[in-house]
Each structure stands twice: as structure tokens, then as C-alpha cells.
Amino acid sequence: MTQDMNDSPGLFDKYLSENRIFRDREVLRHSYRPHILPHRKPQIDQIAAILAPALQTETPSNILIYGKTGTGKTASVRYVGSELESVSARRGTVCRVIHLNCEVIDTQYRVLAQISKLIMGEDETPSDKIKTHIPMTGWPTDQVYSELKNQIELNSGVFIIILDEIDKLVKKSGDDTLYNLTRINTDLNRSKVSIIGISNDLGFKTFLDPRVLSSLSEEELVFPPYNAPQLCDILQQRAVIGFAEDALEDEVIPLCAALAAQEHGDARRALDLLRISGELADRENGSKVTVEHVKKAQAKIETDSMVECIRTLPTQSKIVLYCMLLLHRAGQRIFISGDVTRIYKELTPFLEIDVLTARRISDLISELNMLGVINTRLVNRGRHGRTKEMWFDTNTDKIWEVIMEESDGRLAQVDEQIVVQILR
């Protein structure tokens, strides 16, 4: 048996042969940082102008940066930050850029502790005075803040603190973190701190105290969505490095750009489309990426997004969606909110969950519509009044599979014939 296995082709041999599609697929990922960011020079120049005083050991203005996902906000700020640190090192001044993702680090304690950790980590020869490492939990917040101030002061210089996804921090933990950080300069003598907040959500400002907003938004920048020609340029820049010569049909990049332009000009979506198209061609052992591969990649991305969306739904939303799936599987291609409510109320005793009102069920249906899981429309039924009709415009097999996985086996025990009995 061992001999047979040794003589047979290795499981990965076909994937290790010369790749006819990719030269370096890593350049097609979001994490890759190109040396030039196409169509973002005005924004980069603005950020550089605002941060330039740091090179004179002066305090730069705080900045709030807005823009939808995939519009180059983080990449532009990181690019300027890297250039700032390089110029600072050549001039013999101290400018440090500290980047935090507030989707992950989303409490005041963790933000302050992480800033401290990054400051300590960047100091190759720390002062003997700075021996205290702030633990990630356990201290009173005022002690963490006091220790962070000491570390900033003893590492004298200008610190640019980037709070990416700042809206996630504010929505979860309030604006205390920003209140403290925007006022930290009043307690410093040898160092300066500037804050850059990056957000996809303009509305998060409503969560801020006016004093915090005033301090934080000394400068505001908006990153507009990319249009299709701009996305073409971005993809072309990456494709030259990432794909083998002649691996792409001429129509592939324009199609990826056009599809992503429809999704609010999202460069990340465009890159994902191009990379996944290449991966599909590669797995087929093809020599070219075609328009058909792009169409398959688009369908795959949409399915993956839908699956992730459904997995993160609250339990009650999953139950309401399950009721709709039962109707669909019973042959009801268009169904009304009243039918969903009747099935829901029949199932709740078996599922041992709190029973929602018809109004709340209608709200959950509206949320599922906004997420793109279902389609709805209001129709007038004469003397019976208005009602909400709904339907699925996608294959429901994957949705059903995810709902079954997420239900801990409870829904698998439901007799689907219950729908027929209820609707008689």
C-alpha cells in the first residue's frame, strides 16, 4: 500500500507545476501596498500637508476621513504615514505612526493598552524608566491612561494615532476614548499627539459629544467612490505584476471594473473579482482568464456574502427566514407576511423561543429585504387592506443549508408538511 501511494502522483503536484495564470497573486489582495495609489493624489497631498508640521515637531491637526469601503482611505493614510516616518528618520526627528483597527480593538481600555504596546514595541532601546507594560486587562482605566501618557512623554516625539473603523469604537464604547485622546496634549510637554479617524459611516458623528467632535474634526476629508475607468487603472496596475503575460482576455479587466463600479466604486470588490476569476481559471488548468470566469467569480462572491450575512443574523431573524424558506419549499413562490406570521407562531412553542408580535416580525422581514436576502413589495388587496408580498430571487439551497447548520439541529426536526396544514 505504501509503495502504491509513493508511486502515485502527489496530491498537490498539479498545483506546483508552472502556473500559467498567476505570476504573483499576492499583489491582488487587499493587504498589498503598491508604491503608487492611482487616482488618490489629491487626497494624499491633503493628508501630507496636514501632517507636515510633525516634521518640525509641531502638532498636526486631527483629521476625520470618510468614504465607502474600498475607496482607498486606509491605503492612502498608511502611504502618507510611511513616507512621514521615512522623512522623519532622515531628518533626525521622531515621528511615529500607530495604526489600530477599531473593529477588533473596540474598547477604551484595549485602545489605550494597544497604543502603549505599539509604542513600546517600536522602541528598540527603551529607557530604563519605561519598564511597565500595560496588561490587556486588569487595570483601572485611569491608571492605563496615566501610564500611556508617561510612555508617550518619555519617548519624546510626535505620535500620529490612526483609528481605523473609528465608528465601531464609538458605537460600542462611546466617545470617552476620543475625549481623552483629543485632550492628551494638554498633559504633555515633550511630545505631541495627533488623531486620524477613518470611517465608512458619516452618521457616526451623531454619537459624539459636540466638544469631542469639534476637537476630532479639525480637518475633514471625503474619499469619493472610484468610477469604472479609475478601477480599470487600479486593476491594470496590479495585473501587470500579478498575472502571467497574456493570461487575461481583453474584456476581463473592464468587466471587473464595471461590476465593482456598480457596487459604489469598491476597489476591494474589483480586486476580489479579478483574483477569484484567476483562481477559477487556474483550478480548471486553463491558460486564460475569460469573461465566463468573471461571471462565475461574481456569483461566488455574492453567494459567500449572502452566507456570511445569514450566519450573523440574530436568532429571531433566522427563524423568520426559516418560515419563508418553508413556504418557498412548499411551492409558494410569492407569499405574504400573514402566512409567515402564522407559521412562525405555530413553530415558536416547539422551538422554545419568545413569541414576537406581528409588527416586530414585519420589521425583521424589512431588515431581511434591506440585506438583500429576500425581495418585498407592498400590495393593495382592496377591502383586505395592504399587505407585504415577498419572494426569493436567488437559489435557496445554500440559504437552507446555512440555516440548518446554524440551528443546532432543532429546525431539522420540524415536519415541513406543517406548512400545508397551516395554509389549508
Swiss-Prot record:
Residues annotated for ATP binding in this entry: 71-75, 226, 238
Gene3D superfamilies per record: 1.10.8.60, P-loop containing nucleotide triphosphate hydrolases, Winged helix-like DNA-binding domain superfamily/Winged helix DNA-binding domain
The UniProt record lists the keyword Nucleotide-binding: yes
Sorted UniProt keywords: ATP-binding, DNA replication, Nucleotide-binding
Source organism superkingdom: Archaea
Presence of the UniProt keyword Nucleotide-binding in the record: yes
Annotated SMART domains: AAA (SM00382), Cdc6_C (SM01074)
Pfam families with a match to the protein in the record: AAA_16, Cdc6_C, Cdc6_lid
One GO BP annotation of this record: DNA replication
GO molecular function: ATP binding; ATP hydrolysis activity
Coiled coil: none
Family recorded in the similarity comment: Belongs to the CDC6/cdc18 family.
Function: Involved in regulation of DNA replication.
Protein name: ORC1-type DNA replication protein
